[in-house]
Swiss-Prot record:
SMART domains for this protein: NGF
Name of the protein described by the UniProt record: Neurotrophic factor BDNF
Secreted among keywords: yes
Pfam families: NGF (PF00243)
Name of encoding gene: BDNF
Annotated organism of origin: Macrovipera lebetinus
Amino acid sequence: KCSTKGYAKEGCRGIDKRYWNSQCRTTQSYVRALTMDNKKRIG
């Protein structure tokens, strides 16, 4: 589940397929943080 801001089929924000994997991993970690905050209702 990556950001939909991109032209990649998977929806990741990578410029090239090489960077797609890195961007996807970074996005997943970021999403996990948001999910944890959401469960704790912080903010």
